[in-house]
């Protein structure tokens, strides 16, 4: 079984990369390009590494306390933007602790998915590995969105939820996600709007220092989408606190 998983993973890697040559932290493949570890990438990597220990507890208790069941609806709505089918290859960029996996439609057999998750925070990935690895055929990579270690046209599904607002190079990240998606794939890019960042992150005791100078410009996000895509659409969800940007390769 392990050999089969590694063979499938090898087929997705950039030419010249070999599964057996990656350094690993437990079962997490290490592929972080230090050229992108500056500015906001470095700042928010540090933030999530520090918050990882309490992140899931906050999501479980504080989120519902503040927002009730509306946050569950948001996550289900986001998953409905993706064209799920059994037996597909999936790339989730900024997978975090993997809690969104439980909102994948119940009609989908999670263990049939060939699932790869990427995140810039090793601590979030370690939490993800502990909580999600047994639920699906999940392989995790410590990497940045601007330099994915995967070959062109490798994934049936590619999506990103949470983080791109503060990537160093949004256009490069979107180009990378488009590059590794198979032709015809519908991609999802989603994150908080300025309203949520201002009302929540800039006032939260644990995050306010990281976000005090942060700005979110939806036009900047839209303009970062590669010009060659088709069917580009921007939706506002959760009473305008979240956006879902979709397009097709």
Regions found by a protein language model. Give the residues of each.
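Conserved class I S-adenosyl-L-methionine
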Residues: 23-84, 99-103, 124-127, 131, ...
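Short glycine-centered segments of the SAM/dcSAM-binding site in methyltransferase folds
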Residues: 89, 185-186
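Class I SAM-dependent methyltransferase SAM/SAH-binding core
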Residues: 89-147
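Short beta->alpha hinge that forms the Motif I/post-I loop of the SAM-binding pocket
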Residues: 119-120, 169, 192
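A conserved beta-strand element that flanks and buttresses the S-adenosyl-L-methionine
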Residues: 159
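Short catalytic micro-motifs in class I SAM-dependent methyltransferases
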Residues: 162-163
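A short glycine-rich, Lys/Arg-flanked "PGG" loop and its adjoining helix->strand segment in the class I
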Residues: 171-183
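C-terminal alpha-helical "lid/dimerization" subdomain adjacent to the S-adenosyl-L-methionine
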Residues: 186-246
